[in-house]
């Protein structure tokens, strides 16, 4: 099994006990010492054996990757003068590329950090369209939050937020700013902040926190 599975197993074991430490890790290190790449997936390891939970992450990641890439390419082809009238060709190409993306050797322990990017881009681009219904917008917002809950801020989240913010600034300067996309960006940021709040507080020395294992190494 991948080494990241240890983080899921220990965090799942102490998910509801209210403890700030993991007794089995480094003789009782802080919970923030083991961060999970896809925090919401800890529920799988709480309910299922490790091998089954990891398999579920692989299947879910590949599925989201395939669907996201398929929808993204299908949407892009609608605006193409060459491909807009060739739905059969577009469908075949989208299916082929989607399958290729779904079978890329991404590690399942990272959740949607890689697999979920095409679907995120698709949702963000559709939010720019003003003719979307409220129900559709809510679905796009829901996926943005779902992506944040099942991806890592360190692995891909910071890059997504940064590139997205630059895009919003450029759009604002060109007077093409989308309020819906701005709301989605804020939702993703808040999701990451909620997930990593304890870690940020420890980094900035806010409140009481346990001594990190790295600090203990330095002291000894």
Q: Language-model segments: which ranges?
A:
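Short, charged/polar low-complexity linear motifs in solvent-exposed/disordered segments
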Residues: 173-174, 219
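Membrane-interface coil-to-helix junctions
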Residues: 1-69, 110-112, 204-207, 213-214, ...
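Alpha-helical transmembrane segments with an aromatic anchor "belt"
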Residues: 53-59, 77-88
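Membrane-embedded helix bundles of polyisoprenyl
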Residues: 63-75, 85-128, 133-172, 181-204
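Membrane-interface helix-loop-helix junctions at transmembrane boundaries of multi-pass membrane enzymes
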Residues: 177-179
